[in-house]
Amino acid sequence: MKQVCVLGNGQLGRMLRQAGEPLGIAVWPVGLDAEPAAVPFQQSVITAEIERWPETALTRELARHPAFVNRDVFPIIADRLTQKQLFDKLHLPTAPWQLLAERSEWPAVFDRLGELAIVKRRTGGYDGRGQWRLRANETEQLPAECYGECIVEQGINFSGEVSLVGARGFDGSTVFYPLTHNLHQDGILRTSVAFPQANAQQQAQAEEMLSAIMQELGYVGVMAMECFVTPQGLLINELAPRVHNSGHWTQNGASISQFELHLRAITDLPLPQPVVNNPSVMINLIGSDVNYDWLKLPLVHLHWYDKEVRPGRKVGHLNLTDSDTSRLTATLEALIPLLPPEYASGVIWAQSKFG
């Protein structure tokens, strides 16, 4: 039996474990503070559900492990500075940017990047945290410790957000899912919609870009690339060197889920192109209690993470997939009264994708 240790024991590790069971792959999600002696890592392939981690007894051991897949890639992608430098090196389109080193740079920043600046911490900061949208009269809002520790990007006037989830094997082969349409609110992914056939031009551009990135890094496994949709084409926003929230729909909407695909890649199992036959919708459950009335709707698949419910915390998701888009939109309509009021706009957005 193959064994995989996942650095991190959140919901992504949990879903990797679930995906491993049918394949006979024992997956062990482990907390960063676990005692090394209690973790069966010696004969395991090592992967991670997070981009960066503190130094602990366990992470020191794993850093030396010869089967820690992508170990040297994580630091490059975890730092937005080196991530952006990678895009520039490969001549891939991304929002104009620079390192924000000193407060005195602001006039030149706005002169170069325009009236809206997006400041992001180089490391950490996700789901809208560690980011600021600033105009010239608002720069005093930025904490002093951010200088030297943040990048600043041009604010992009985009018409939509999409992500590409793909995987690369040890032999260099790559496979991809169709582009996923994403709705973010307050920096948090709320809803995703995927179709069997994405826009051909966007799909081709996205696959070419993500292939170049994975090839350059020698990356193995699933990677996600978030992009802005603009009249000039796609602009890369950020990368995630792991399974990704916007790929959760694949659990019920594809022949191979992103979680199984990642395990296949890192354990050197066959990596065929996943088949997607039907449209899918994913709704993130954020800071909401479970409601089993959702399961009265036959298209709804509930994935509950069994985490303490707190405001702003991802605690589960709902997947819906069907060949009949009218049945999908009707089910989404029936979900609205079963969800807290703040979900309505995301559900209506998903319905709008089906015309």
From Swiss-Prot:
UniProt: ATP binding residues: 80, 120, 125-131, 153-156, 161, 184, 237-238
Cellular compartments per GO CC: cytosol
Keyword line: ATP-binding, Ligase, Nucleotide-binding, Purine biosynthesis
Protein's pathway: Purine metabolism; IMP biosynthesis via de novo pathway; 5-amino-1-(5-phospho-D-ribosyl)imidazole-4-carboxylate from 5-amino-1-(5-phospho-D-ribosyl)imidazole (N5-CAIR route): step 1/2
GO biological process: 'de novo' IMP biosynthetic process
EC numbers: 6.3.4.18
Residues annotated as domain ATP-grasp: 84-267
Free-text function comment from the UniProt entry: Catalyzes the ATP-dependent conversion of 5-aminoimidazole ribonucleotide (AIR) and HCO(3)(-) to N5-carboxyaminoimidazole ribonucleotide (N5-CAIR).
Self-association state and partner proteins as the record states: Homodimer.
Name the record gives this protein: N5-carboxyaminoimidazole ribonucleotide synthase
Organism listed in the record: Escherichia coli (strain K12)
Upper taxonomic lineage: Bacteria, Pseudomonadati, Pseudomonadota, Gammaproteobacteria, Enterobacterales
